[in-house]
C-alpha cells in the first residue's frame, strides 16, 4: 500500500512538471513613454524617456551629438536620460539619430521599439513670457499657470519657449520659471530658471533685469509678452492714490451704492483685475521706457488686466510693440483661458492671425463658457491694436493726426450720460472712443476718415464684446450700447491735470 501511494505521488509530480513545461513563455513587452524626444538647443541640455519592460532590455544608437544612459535595463520601469553634446546653431530643429530598444539579448531578442532623437535650435523661433506681478490675485495666477500646463504637449510650444515670472513668496521677491513638456511623463513640468532675492514690481530696474534674463535663458527670433495684473490704464499711480483717499461712495439711480473711488471696489463685489497691490504699481510711461530700452523687441503684448485697451495707454506703448491685445473695461479675475489661448500663440500662422484667434477665444469663453469657473460673470470685451496705425509708422496719416484735426474742427455738445462708459464708477473715467467721436463730430468727411483709420488701427474682426460688462465698482453687469473696443478719458470730468500730460492728449489737443 505504501509503495502504491509513493508511485501515485511520483506520477503526480511528473504530470505537474509536464503541465508546467507546456505553459507559454510570457510575450515580450517593451514600451516607451514617447516615440520622439526633442533636446533643447544648447550643449548639455537633457531630456528623458521612461522604458517599461517585462524583462531585460538593451539599446543600440545610431547618430551623433548626444549621449544616453543607462544603455540596458531589467524588468519594470527605467528612466533613460539623453544629453546633447553639441549646440544646434541651425535655425530649425535637427535630427540627431535614433535609439533602438530590444528585450532580451542576441538571438533571444523579442519586442523592439525605436526612439527618434531631435534637437531644437539654440535660438527658439518664439519665446512667450507671462509676467504676473503682485500677490492679491495669486490664486488666480496659479490657475492661469495650471491652464498653461494643460496646454503644453509634445507639439505645444514645439521648439518655442514658455516663461513665467511672478511673485509666489512675497512682494519683494520673484521667480522666473519655464513650463515645458516632459517626455518621460507625457505631461508638463515647471523648471525654475532664476530666483530674484530682491524684486520690486514698481521699480523699472527690476523689470529691466527680468526682461534681460528672458533673452539670456530663452533666446528667440520672436518674443511675445503677456502681462497679467491689476490694470489702471494711463492713470499715474500718485493720481490713483490721491483719488482713492479723497472720494467716497456715491449712488446709482434708485439709491443703489456705487463706488467712486480709484481704486476701491464695492464690498462683496466679484473679483476683477482692476485693483489691488497698492504701492507696487508702475506707471505706464515708465513701463514703456523699460520696453523701448531693451536690446530686443516684443512683437506683441497681451494685457490680462483691466482698462488697458485705452487710447492714451496704447499710444504710450506704440513704439514698444507691433500689436497689443487688451480690454477697455474690467477683466474678471479668472483672466484669459490659457489652456485655449496658448496653442494659438505657437501656431504656424502670422502674428496678426494668431492674435485675432486669441481675441476670439477670449470672447467665446466669456460669452459661452463663463460659468465653467467660479466667481465669474458673462463679461468679456476685447480688441486688437495695430500700433503702427496710431502714429503713421505704416506710411499713412496716423490716427493721432486724424483725431487732432477732428478735435480742432467744430463739435457738437451732447448729454454725457448717453455716452458709453466702461466702469461702474459714479463719476466715469473711461468712455468709448468711437462713440465719443460719433456723438461729437459734425464734419461727415472727417468722421469717415477717422472711422477708416480707426478700423486699420483696431480691426473690426477682433473688436468683440459680450452684451454687458461687469464692474466691481457697482457690483453688477452694465449694458453695452455702443462698442468700438477702445476707451478714452477725453470727456471725463476728473484727473484732467494728469490727463493733459499724456502723450495722446498732447498729440491730439489743439488748445
What are these regions (language model features)?
Residues 29-32, 48, 53-81:
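Surface-exposed binding patches on compact interaction domains or structured appendages
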Residues 2, 13-38, 67, 106-122:
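Bacterial Sec-dependent N-terminal signal peptides
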Residues 166-170, 178-188, 199-294, 305-306, ...:
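Catalytic-core segments of thiol-dependent peptidases
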Residues 1-9, 327:
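Bacterial N-terminal signal peptides that target proteins for export
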Residues 251-511:
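Terminal, contiguous helix-loop blocks that mediate binding/assembly
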Residues 80, 91-106:
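A short beta-strand micro-motif common to beta-rich folds, especially ectodomain repeats
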Residues 85-91:
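Short, surface-exposed loop/turn segments at beta-strand-coil junctions that are enriched for proline
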Residues 121-221:
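N-terminal extension/subdomain marker
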